[in-house]
Amino acid sequence: MAGNSIGQIFRVTTFGESHGVALGCIVDGVPPGIPLTEADLQHDLDRRRPGTSRYTTQRREPDQVRILSGVFEGVTTGTSIGLIIENTDQRSQDYGAIKDVFRPGHADYTYEQKYGVRDYRGGGRSSARETAMRVAAGAIAKKYLQQKFGVQVRGYLAQIGDVVCELKDWEQVEQNPFFCPDPDKLEALDELMRALKKEGDSIGAKVSVVAENVPVGLGEPVFDRLDADLAHALMSINAVKGVEIGDGFSVVTKRGSENRDEITPEGFQSNHAGGILGGISSGQAVIAHLALKPTSSIMVPGRTINRQGEAVEMVTRGRHDPCVGIRAVPIAEAMMAIVLMDHLLRQRAQNGDVVSNVPRW
């Protein structure tokens, strides 16, 4: 009802606010016997963690995760896994000026209208700080997918503003603060970030996420199609305003003869569908792209209103990302992994004994 959970068998429920005492989540449906330590989760959390480069918010949270339950002697027990991350670097005084003012482009106005009350400190529950717990839960899913099925989920920054980053080298993604796979674009990205910082403005971005070695058969017709659930999960990430599966909106200008993924005895000849046909995984790489809006927390004055409906001009102070798309890469990976793990467990539960003589590649 409250919209704080995702998944049916592998189910993740998060709680906490940006400037609250802590963030937490409960992860249900994790199979028993999976080796799991806090270090397994910390790797991805460190990739998402704020304050790690000059291109992201300078709020410095260690994001040290603690496992509270569901793991005994280094392996999962099959019971609920409780996770918690304490907030340590809140500066709530930065937000006192907006207590009675609605920041344009943020959730302040809609939360106030929906609940009649809001935590104005850092956006409260609407803050992207909440996604730390998604990344922690996603790390569990990523480990299970990799160990049990050889599925690898990876993401990268595909575009910031007018700077397009081609997928040239996966290894480059972890070698720079932008998660950029194209080393030739790093200088342009750096120049863009410096210009935005000087102007006090922000910029949008495109993030791509790819899952390889996904088994064929994942997805439930008709409302729980794999692509529908992926779109739901990825659209739930803060600032995401669009999701594409495979070639996405570019199919508008294509003919059917060029867009269809033809099949030969050697396998599929293309992957315009992004690894999903009829809402069910085809065994090809599952590919999704996300469009993220530029953050509205900027130093450029903007018009808004206060609680009394009076016109106000404001500047959003605090520590903010000039491009939220940079830190969205591990978040997108986590959400794709969560959906894939849930569908793998659902497929195993219903169709685990199904045998098909049709070739698989």
Curated annotation (Swiss-Prot):
Please give the biological process terms from Gene Ontology that the record holds. amino acid biosynthetic process; aromatic amino acid family biosynthetic process; chorismate biosynthetic process
Similarity field: Belongs to the chorismate synthase family.
Q: What is this protein called?
A: Chorismate synthase
What the entry lists under PROSITE patterns is as follows: CHORISMATE_SYNTHASE_1, CHORISMATE_SYNTHASE_2, CHORISMATE_SYNTHASE_3
Upper classification of the organism = Bacteria, Pseudomonadati, Pseudomonadota, Gammaproteobacteria, Enterobacterales
Catalyzed chemical reaction(s): 5-O-(1-carboxyvinyl)-3-phosphoshikimate = chorismate + phosphate
The alphabetized UniProt keywords are: Amino-acid biosynthesis, Aromatic amino acid biosynthesis, FAD, Flavoprotein, FMN, Lyase, NADP
**Gene name, Swiss-Prot/TrEMBL:** aroC
Per its record, what are the GO molecular function terms? chorismate synthase activity; FMN binding
Any Pfam family matching the protein: Chorismate_synt
Reported function: This reaction introduces a second double bond into the aromatic ring system.
Spell out the disulfide connections: none
